[in-house]
């Protein structure tokens, strides 16, 4: 479901978006603070107010949790054990897509750490999120808007596939797959494989919300219709993808420490990290 439709449904059912609104920040954590100072050239004494102002403007139009809770300044890509490899490969010319990139904040981390912007792409179903990324990072002259593509990953006719099918070396997916049920996740995974070069070493890196207690999760499905994996279901997903596509993959997974899970209302939630490599 498109995020606009999800929001409208929630509001219709009586959801109060103020519940998603966190009090203004008094500090901005690293690495975003340094990125805004050195990459975006925001004066040191203006960083906090700049972030708060962008959040408030965005939330007035798009009252989503990722905006209200300042998730866009909580970067995670560098926490992945695959980050060093992703960084070195993109420095050498390999092409990376951040799928479901929101404000494109993880792309700015890669640029700040030395990746040429021309080797990076971002895609989100919400064009306004891509535009808000420019309001936050003030870097349209550094990261051309041609590198950011508004598209639905389920639409094989979209600009994303017209431009990048078979062209990418790495696709990064963070906290995105859970909005789809299991069957649609299979389709998403197959579509992502179509974006990658059909050669050994092409890689998907994932950061996935997972749940140890699937019975607790099942009880919440009506009011929170997300599909949170456990390790068994995650492995089953990629086994099914290999079966349906005939593509051989190597899947490695791990539990990844993450501040996000401390805020989650359900017990047993954790972050599952994974790399999926084409053999």
Swiss-Prot record:
The protein's annotated pathway: Secondary metabolite biosynthesis; terpenoid biosynthesis
Annotated S-adenosyl-L-methionine binding sites: 124-125, 152-153
GO biological process: methylation; terpenoid biosynthetic process
Domain of life of the source: Eukaryota
Enzyme Commission numbers on file: 2.1.3.-
GO molecular function terms listed in the Swiss-Prot or TrEMBL record: methyltransferase activity
Keywords on record: Methyltransferase, S-adenosyl-L-methionine, Transferase
Function: Methyltransferase; part of the gene cluster that mediates the biosynthesis of paraherquonin, a meroterpenoid with a unique, highly congested hexacyclic molecular architecture. The first step of the pathway is the synthesis of 3,5-dimethylorsellinic acid (DMOA) by the polyketide synthase prhL.
Name used for this protein in its record: Methyltransferase prhM
Lineage, uppermost ranks: Eukaryota, Fungi, Dikarya, Ascomycota, Pezizomycotina
Gene this chain is encoded by: prhM
